[in-house]
Amino acid sequence: MVSTGWSNVTPWKTFREAPEPELAKRLEAMIPANANMSRMVFNFHCPPYGSNLDEAPEIDQDLNVKEAGRSMVPVGSTAVRDAIRRYQPLLSLHGHIHEGKGTARIGKTLAINAGSLYEQGVLQGALVELDPKKGIKSYTLTTG
């Protein structure tokens, strides 16, 4: 498993944000050269750009949500997307974008964002059953 809490730059300017080229270098440095990608899990906080796991409400220059949250835009990371496309791990797990609950396929890789409803006091998660021979046996998104 390769894990990181780093993300691409956001309007919120939080700790552990990096421009896409720097994030790409960080990811490359963490991924072992001879790793067995058929058993590899990427646990990257930021979801891949354009995957539908990264759809968030569009905001204006004053950080206010536009159109009452009806206008959604992709805000994930191109560096994360490119790493998944290049290495094709078995599974990639993501968070960061609370509205991005769901799954996506990027090549052979199953990507999951469990989403978040923490402001409502609701825990969301993903249960993934792995089989040493078959890879991903099953998965379920949970709310509770």
Q: At which residue positions do the language-model features occur?
A:
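Binuclear metal-dependent phosphoesterase catalytic core
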Residues: 18, 81-87, 99-144
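Active-site neighborhood of phospho(di)ester-bond hydrolases with catalytic His/Asp-centered motifs
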Residues: 41-45, 74-75, 84-99, 112-115
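Conserved catalytic scaffold of divalent metal-dependent phosphoesterases
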Residues: 1-72
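Generic alpha-helix detector with strongest preference for long hydrophobic helices that associate
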Residues: 61-65, 73-74, 92, 109-111, ...
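Active-site metal-binding loops of divalent metal-dependent hydrolases
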Residues: 4-8, 46, 95-97, 115-117, ...
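Short amphipathic alpha-helical segments and helix-helix/interface helices
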Residues: 28-32, 77-84
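Short intrinsically disordered, low-complexity coil segments enriched in acidic
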Residues: 1-4, 81, 91
